[in-house]
């Protein structure tokens, strides 16, 4: 059974009397929308078509927020959450909605945001890229919290919009081998004498094994290190310690870097604890395949890949024979991408470190750009898109993890003579409101 620990007490809020409201739709964050006294009311956990009993928890000039107390009339799309920690853990927020409806809602939200802010619609809305809705995450970061009174360390995920840690026994969206480790890891950590020095725990299921990276704020005793090493060896784990300077030390395992590969390639994309990778392996494979298909790079073309990371898109694009220039803002990832390209024997791809908020058109290594791919963080790539008029690629694939920033950046792209020809929702994170998306822009004629 889940135990709920609070890092600090929350300030109590004045609740309204109980209200019965009719939910009409979902917002793009997955909250139900109802109306009361002329204002929109956002209700987490409520679904369209439902009558729900709520209490108002926050009242602003134009909207209110409410706590769901009871579903009086349930939607036919409502299902029972599979996770026993669902109502407390902040990791998932749509398990109460069947997966088909989740995907339909996300696709609709994406199209509405782009239409609203970019004042356009795609010529073609492509099929949603998706796979299994459960046990899909190959990587997760678990939080820890040490209770000074009980001397117990909790291992789990943060509660929604809170620093509180919800101790969990399993996770239904985490890969099964990783989920099975959680209770044993929690027990192990509580046997250590240096519990107060433990930070987060990063779990990764790579192609070459399971990696457990334990963040520590100070050196552990030899006895604690031995316990960790023995646990790692007995469970065939690659157990590593990481200090505050991001230095890592291997305690057990083969000592190699984790890597993943694509089904149609022998290339190994190696990565380190601090490197970003997509957590959903099968959907990432489909997304990369679609990006290559949309751009259709030719052997005589030059392709620019911005925010290239460790080469997730760059290496598959380079397999076509095109020259690929990958640009990344994190030096360590540029170095890793270069190593990955060399290991794959791809000699027409090169990687550079640059400030991606600056104008790249004058960089001596850039030259002519025929096609372009961009995969920015949640903040988007507003500054990079302003330089399109100088680069003038014939086609641009924009991969986004935030539909709001995609919508904003689309407006900039369209103003520079491009048309939005294709768009697709990418269900990278089932059971949550989060989504990836892909858009193809082509230079107008």
From Swiss-Prot:
The keyword 4Fe-4S applies. This is 23S rRNA (uracil(1939)-C(5))-methyltransferase RlmD. Keywords: 4Fe-4S, Iron, Iron-sulfur, Metal-binding, Methyltransferase, rRNA processing, S-adenosyl-L-methionine, Transferase. Signal peptide: none annotated. The gene is rlmD. It comes from Shewanella piezotolerans (strain WP3 / JCM 13877). It holds the Pfam family tRNA_U5-meth_tr. Belongs to the class I-like SAM-binding methyltransferase superfamily. RNA M5U methyltransferase family. RlmD subfamily. HAMAP family: 23SrRNA_methyltr_RlmD (MF_01010). The active site is at 401 (nucleophile). [4Fe-4S] cluster binds at residues 83, 89, 92, 171. GO terms for biological process: rRNA base methylation. It comes from the Bacteria. Catalyzes the formation of 5-methyl-uridine at position 1939 (m5U1939) in 23S rRNA. Residues 12-70 form the TRAM domain. One of its GO terms (molecular function) is iron ion binding. Its EC number is 2.1.1.190. PROSITE patterns: SAM_MT_RNA_M5U, TRAM, TRMA_1, TRMA_2. S-adenosyl-L-methionine binds at residues 278, 307, 312, 328, 355, 375. It catalyses: uridine(1939) in 23S rRNA + S-adenosyl-L-methionine = 5-methyluridine(1939) in 23S rRNA + S-adenosyl-L-homocysteine + H(+).
């Amino acid at each position: 059974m889940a135990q709920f620990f609070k890092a600090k007490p929350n300030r109590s809020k004045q609740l309204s009397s109980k209200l019965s409201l009719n939910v009409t739709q979902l917002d793009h964050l997955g909250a139900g929308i109802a109306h009361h006294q002329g204002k929109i009311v956002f209700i987490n956990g409520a679904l369209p078509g439902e009558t729900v009993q709520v209490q108002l928890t926050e009242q602003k000039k134009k909207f209110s927020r409410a706590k769901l107390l009871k579903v009086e009339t349930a939607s036919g799309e409502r299902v029972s959450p599979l996770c026993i920690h669902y109502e407390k853990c902040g990791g998932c927020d749509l398990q109460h909605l069947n997966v088909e409806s989740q995907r339909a809602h996300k696709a609709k939200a994406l199209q509405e945001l782009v239409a609203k802010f970019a004042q356009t619609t795609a010529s073609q809305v492509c099929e949603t890229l998706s796979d299994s809705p459960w046990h899909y995450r190959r990587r997760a970061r678990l939080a820890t919290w040490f209770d000074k009174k009980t001397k117990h360390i909790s291992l789990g995920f943060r509660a929604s919009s809170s620093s509180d840690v919800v101790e969990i026994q399993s996770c239904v969206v985490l890969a099964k081998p990783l989920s099975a480790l959680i209770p044993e890891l929690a027990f192990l950590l509580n046997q250590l004498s240096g519990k107060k020095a433990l930070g987060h725990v990063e779990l990764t299921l790579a192609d070459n094994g399971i990696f457990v990276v334990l963040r520590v704020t100070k050196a552990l005793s030899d006895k604690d290190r031995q316990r960790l090493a023995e646990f790692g060896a007995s469970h065939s784990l690659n157990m590593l310690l990481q200090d505050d300077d991001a230095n890592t030390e291997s305690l057990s395992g083969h000592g190699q870097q984790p890597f993943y590969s694509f089904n149609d390639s022998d290339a190994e994309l190696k990565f380190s604890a601090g490197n970003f990778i997509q957590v959903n392996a099968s959907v990432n494979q489909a997304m990369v395949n679609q990006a290559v298909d949309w751009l259709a790079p030719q052997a005589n073309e030059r392709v620019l890949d911005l925010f290239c990371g460790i080469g997730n898109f760059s290496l598959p694009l380079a397999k076509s024979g095109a020259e690929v220039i990958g640009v990344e803002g994190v030096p360590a990832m540029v170095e890793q991408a270069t190593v990955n390209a060399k290991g794959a024997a791809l000699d027409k791809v090169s990687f550079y470190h640059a400030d991606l908020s600056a104008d790249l058109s004058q960089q001596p290594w850039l030259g002519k750009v025929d096609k372009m791919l961009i995969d920015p963080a949640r903040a988007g790539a507003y500054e990079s898109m302003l330089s399109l008029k100088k680069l003038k690629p014939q086609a641009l694939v924009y991969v986004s993890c935030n539909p709001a920033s995609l919508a904003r950046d689309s407006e900039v792209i369209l103003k520079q003579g491009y048309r939005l020809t294709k768009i697709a929702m990418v269900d990278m994170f089932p059971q949550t409101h989060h989504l990836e998306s892909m858009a193809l822009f082509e230079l107008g004629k």
